[in-house]
A protein has these predicted regions:
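Short coil-to-helix leader/linker segments, especially the first N-terminal amphipathic alpha-helix
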Residues: 1-10
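Subtilisin-like serine protease catalytic core
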Residues: 9-24, 29-310, 324
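Substrate-binding/specificity loop regions of serine endopeptidase catalytic domains
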Residues: 310, 333-350
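Aromatic/hydrophobic pocket-lining residues that form the small-molecule binding cavity
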Residues: 314
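Short acidic/polar active-site loop segments enriched in Thr and Asp
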Residues: 327
Length: 350
């Protein structure tokens, strides 16, 4: 590895005995513990046997080489994990999912009608709007759905205003609407944004006929399309099977006995490659020399190929590593969002 001076370190240590083999806890996607280049360096839990019993009484059955925190009792493993933003959106969906912003005013569609919304917990609502919304495709898809209702309301308002201005005009044009309904300089609403959207649609369809554009913006099919888009987004990003496969409460750090001992996951190639950089036999022709040929790899699975690890899994994996003598703990990449309470679990574990 460039910059690490590993070869020089081995020269310096030549002739010296290793007092204890360091344990490197690799927290990530899993590894192939039977890989010929790694199996001599796989950590073994000396207090555990592969006999279907929890021999060391730590709550994890047959954790001989580590543990999988995204696995189920039946041997299944979650195929992917959601991003933290999606998990947080689903946590707040019933409170804020149907809230949209119009300038300085927020509206809620919780009752099926547009009503002014005032949050009971301003700090929580600001966290949702400023942090969760930006990191959630689901939140944005749902907001778009409700914004279609807002744009329809504005379109009806524009129609009313332009017809009041030109009561006797037979054919109203989009240009008429833009002229009459343009927002003032002090207007903080999304009136101008809706008008701009109307212009874009009119230009795309190469028409200046207000009646045809009006029908597009108030059509019921727009609302149906918005719901279908949200449903497609949810199907892709909104359910990673945690409840069905793992079955724990991911928001309860005390609900800690879950998972399985499956370390060879569908995404284990990533971890196997990383492990091969860290440990293994040196001097083998055709292979790169690893950093530490005497180290052992403890495998802790918290992540699949897609998404971001659950912070509860991360915290428990760190605690597992410490409790079982890890000298070094390697974490996966940072999450995009750290909810305050769950962040505290991580801090306490570290």
């Amino acid at each position: 590895m460039y910059g690490a001076c590993v070869n020089e370190a081995y020269e310096f240590l030549k002739g010296k005995k290793v007092k204890a083999r360091p344990i490197v806890a690799l927290i990530g996607t899993g590894i192939d513990t039977e890989h010929e280049g790694l199996k001599a360096n796989i950590w073994k839990n000396k207090k555990e046997k592969a006999d279907g019993k929890d021999n060391d009484k730590n709550g994890y059955v047959d954790d001989v080489n580590g543990w999988n925190f995204i696995g189920g009792k039946d041997g299944q493993v979650m195929p992917f994990v959601m991003r933290e933003g999606e998990r947080e959106f689903l946590r707040f969906k019933d409170k804020y999912g149907d809230v949209v912003r119009d300038g300085d005013i927020y509206y809620s569609f919780a009752t099926g009608k547009k009503e002014i919304f005032t949050p009971e917990n301003a700090e929580e609502f600001n966290y949702y709007r400023q942090c969760v919304y930006k990191e959630s495709r689901l939140a944005q898809a749902m907001s778009t759905k409700w914004m279609d209702h807002v744009s329809a309301d504005y379109t009806r308002l524009f129609d009313k205003e332009v017809r009041a201005k030109y009561p006797n005009k037979e054919k109203i044009t989009v240009a008429d609407v833009i002229e009459v309904c343009a927002p003032s300089k002090d207007d903080t609403s999304i009136r101008g944004m809706i008008l701009y959207g109307i212009q874009i649609v009119a230009n795309t369809r190469r028409t200046d006929d207000w009646e045809s554009i009006y029908k597009i913006f108030v059509a019921e099919s727009r609302f149906t399309d918005g719901q279908q888009k949200y449903d497609r987004t949810y199907a892709k990003y909104g359910n990673d099977g945690r409840q069905a496969i793992v079955g724990d409460n991911y928001l309860d750090i005390n609900d800690r006995v879950y998972g399985n001992n499956v370390l060879l996951t569908a995404d284990a190639a990533i971890g196997t490659m990383i492990a091969g950089v860290i440990v293994g036999q040196r001097g083998v022709e055709g292979r790169n020399n690893p950093i530490a040929d005497q180290a052992e790899i403890m495998t802790l699975v918290v992540q699949a190929g897609e998404g971001e690890p659950y912070l509860k899994d991360m915290a428990l994996a760190i605690r597992y590593a410490v409790d079982h003598g890890a000298s070094v703990i390697m974490l996966p990449q940072q999450n995009s969002l750290y909810p305050e309470e769950q962040k505290q679990w991580m801090s306490e574990a570290i």
